[in-house]
């Protein structure tokens, strides 16, 4: 059994999309902390934040992180999971942390194209491009500090998955046919 693989990065970097594809390529299970949390409390992230504030949401997010962390699991985390020092240390110690890095323009384009965009609470109350830029400026150093690997997430999901697999130790990779994928 391999330690969990944690995908971190801002909204729109592809954590869920890449996570599902990476799980399929490695034969790992897939978990998403936001989806796990929403299914267990039967509320959207926006509703949790509205009822409990960001502090309440962050506490629930830590519980979700611990609940989904298991060997041979790819975990897509919420964009702000790295704001809690415990979460950063936990992921770095327990698993392999992969920062999916993308520029503001890519993130904004992806977020604008997302059908679930209205379910995500605004973090600053500002226009999307301004919010993404500010949030990334605040969090980039934390993503980098937490990550074992930093991967360019501007490419296609298949290319990103291939780059992640190439960066990981061979014991993480699943042999498909005669080649590692």
UniProtKB/Swiss-Prot annotation:
Compartments where located: Cytoplasm
Region: LID domain, residue numbers: 112-126
Enzyme class: transferase
Pathway this chain belongs to: Metabolic intermediate biosynthesis; chorismate biosynthesis; chorismate from D-erythrose 4-phosphate and phosphoenolpyruvate: step 5/7
Coiled coil: none
CC cofactor: Mg(2+)
Keyword Nucleotide-binding in record: yes
Annotated cofactor note: Binds 1 Mg(2+) ion per subunit.
Residues that hold substrate according to the record: 34, 58, 79, 139
Catalytic activity line of the entry: shikimate + ATP = 3-phosphoshikimate + ADP + H(+)
One GO CC term, this protein: cytosol
Enzyme Commission identifier(s): 2.7.1.71
Top-level taxonomic group: Bacteria
Protein name per UniProt: Shikimate kinase 2
């Amino acid at each position: 059994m391999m330690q969990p693989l944690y995908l971190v990065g801002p909204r729109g970097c592809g954590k869920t999309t890449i996570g599902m594809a990476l799980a399929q390529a490695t034969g790992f299970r897939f978990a998403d902390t936001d989806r796990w949390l929403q299914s267990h409390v039967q509320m959207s992230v926006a509703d949790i934040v509205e009822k409990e504030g960001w502090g309440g949401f962050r506490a629930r997010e830590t519980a979700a992180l611990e609940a989904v962390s298991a060997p041979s699991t790819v975990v897509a985390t919420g964009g702000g999971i790295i704001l809690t020092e415990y979460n950063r240390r936990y992921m770095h110690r327990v698993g392999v942390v992969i920062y999916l890095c993308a520029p503001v323009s890519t993130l904004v384009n992806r977020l604008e194209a997302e059908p679930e965009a209205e379910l995500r609470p605004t973090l600053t109350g500002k226009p999307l491009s301004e919010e993404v830029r500010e949030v990334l400026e605040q969090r980039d150093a934390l993503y980098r500090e937490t990550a074992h690997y930093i991967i360019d997430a501007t490419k296609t999901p298949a290319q990103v998955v291939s780059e992640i697999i190439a960066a990981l130790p061979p014991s993480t990779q699943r042999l498909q046919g005669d080649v590692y994928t």
